[in-house]
Amino acid sequence: MKLLEIKIESSYDVEDALAYFATEDLKALGTEARRRSDFEQAGWLHDSTVVDMDDIPNLPDELEFIAYFDEETDPEEMVKCFKDKLAELAGYGLKTAPGEISVDYVADQDWNTVWKKYYHVINLSRHLAIVPEWEDYQPAFKDQEIIRLDPGLAFGTGNHQTTQLAMLGIERAMVKPLTVADVGTGSGILAIAAHKLGAKSVLATDISDESMTAAEENAALNGIHDIALQKTSLLADVDGKFDLIVANILAEILLDLIPQLDSHLNEDGQVIFSGIDYLQLPKIEQALAENSFQIDLKMRAGRWIGLAISRKHD
């Protein structure tokens, strides 16, 4: 069996948007990202190894985004869909150039193994490290929590700045055991992080069957079997209130989530948002204010913004 491979040369600005679009809208079997910055940082990440950039084949100027589809998928239709999406993202002021798209077919077994070469240990903080299941790792500190992860076919490996901002927000908020809702869980990484950091209970929601499966499998990989999983759109049909609501999703979807927060957040609860491009921050700020929420902390990594949010108090 072969897979249809769509490669897009673009920028860091649109990585999350392309991954979400490919997985959720186009139902890609999987996605992969090759970032120039990953190779430039290789010395810091991997025992100070010296990397000659000229020796790396087909190194992207910034980002090479790859999506995999069933062999029977119409390549021309997929190219058109991605071109339209890039045009839409450019309309938001995001950098999409060069925007070159190429098509190829690869053997199925290549997808299952080759992409893992680009995914390594991430020492997120003093208290958290993200470790792919196929790598050995000894914690940097005795009490450092390890999140074992096989991202499989779901969105969220821990590599991207938006995921890391969300995890740092969870770590900051978790000063005592909290009830947590992870909205748009993807691979389950944020739900697992909350559990590892001492959450009282965790609910993970997503609209995708693939995400539900990946989150359950990744939780089991970490010996966790009590994260509640619910297939739903955002917090629709979710019962109860939570001390902490976390969402690392696109700004346009966060705008749909904001009106749902009040009925699902405990009185003194907190909200962590990530996935916000700085150009879209004003829209989020306005929507939060209109729904009686305030921003307590802004975090930034590159052009991405993370927010710690609570109710306004007179």
UniProtKB/Swiss-Prot annotation:
Pfam families listed in its UniProt record: PrmA (PF06325)
Statement: the UniProt record of this protein carries the keyword Methyltransferase: yes
Key words, A-Z: Cytoplasm, Methyltransferase, S-adenosyl-L-methionine, Transferase
What the entry lists under InterPro entries is as follows: Ribosomal_L11_MeTrfase_PrmA (IPR050078), Ribosomal_PrmA_MeTrfase (IPR004498), SAM-dependent_MTases_sf (IPR029063)
Cellular compartment(s): Cytoplasm
Q: Principal place where this protein is found? A: cytoplasm
What biological-process terms (Gene Ontology) are attached?
methylation
The record lists S-adenosyl-L-methionine as bound by 163, 184, 206, 248
Quickly give the catalysed reaction.
L-lysyl-[protein] + 3 S-adenosyl-L-methionine = N(6),N(6),N(6)-trimethyl-L-lysyl-[protein] + 3 S-adenosyl-L-homocysteine + 3 H(+)
Q: Which NCBIfam families match?
A: prmA (TIGR00406)
Which family does this protein fall into?
Belongs to the methyltransferase superfamily. PrmA family.
Q: Name the job this protein performs.
A: Methylates ribosomal protein L11.
Q: What is this protein called?
A: Ribosomal protein L11 methyltransferase
Q: From what organism does this protein derive? A: Lactobacillus delbrueckii subsp. bulgaricus (strain ATCC 11842 / DSM 20081 / BCRC 10696 / JCM 1002 / NBRC 13953 / NCIMB 11778 / NCTC 12712 / WDCM 00102 / Lb 14)
